């Protein structure tokens, strides 16, 4: 793990998932906005001067191998549970109940879920606004939920923060879901800082790691 180790040891993480948009004012005074789809996740990660060089030489080698050309799968909160509060699931279902949900369809800004097999007659919200959701079985792209979603015993429609991204060779119908800290991103480095060895036996990075989600 290269980028994942950086995430796990971050002193701060900036998550930028704003839409890429341009705005112009026409000669008639009308404001027009064009949005580029899909929007992507950008992570700016700083690491304090605390990692020990002698026990992290393999990390340095892995970061040099990845550089800005090779992608890595990362999570926030699974590898380092101390970060789980960032992505933690907020809804009312148990992990076992989440595992009983399957996907019916996913198009545009919605994911439709089949909840008929969910046991225990749960009540309340299946998702809270801001929850993370991702299809399972190696689907690449996570989403956030844009409104509270109340549980229904048959089907629920989950509004998501960006248009659903098709993945070559991936069948949506019948898949399960991942939520909370179980979601992952595939990223490459836009900026991979150099490092210095400082007394005693510590690594100092020259700046932030800037990681961008890879859309294939």
Predicted regions and their residues:
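Extracellular/virion structural assembly segments
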Residues: 1-216
């Amino acid at each position: 793990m290269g980028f994942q180790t950086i995430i796990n040891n971050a002193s701060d993480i900036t998550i930028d998932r704003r839409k890429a948009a341009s705005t112009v004012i026409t000669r008639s005074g009308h404001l027009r906005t064009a949005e580029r789809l899909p929007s992507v996740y950008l992570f700016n990660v700083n690491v304090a001067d605390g990692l020990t060089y002698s026990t992290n030489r393999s990390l340095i080698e892995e970061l040099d191998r990845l550089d800005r050309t090779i992608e890595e799968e990362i999570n926030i909160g699974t590898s380092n549970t101390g970060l789980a509060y960032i992505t933690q699931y907020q809804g009312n279902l148990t992990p076992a109940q989440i595992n009983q949900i399957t996907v019916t369809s996913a198009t545009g800004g919605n994911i439709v879920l089949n909840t008929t097999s969910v046991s225990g007659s749960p009540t309340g919200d299946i998702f809270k606004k801001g929850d993370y959701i991702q299809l399972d079985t190696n689907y690449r792209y996570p989403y956030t939920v844009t409104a509270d979603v109340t549980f229904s015993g048959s089907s629920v429609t989950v509004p998501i923060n960006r248009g659903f991204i098709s993945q070559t060779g991936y069948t949506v119908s019948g898949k399960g879901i991942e939520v909370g800290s179980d979601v992952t991103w595939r990223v490459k480095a836009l900026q991979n800082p150099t490092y210095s060895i400082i007394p005693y036996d510590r690594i100092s990075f020259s700046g932030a790691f800037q990681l961008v989600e890879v859309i294939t």
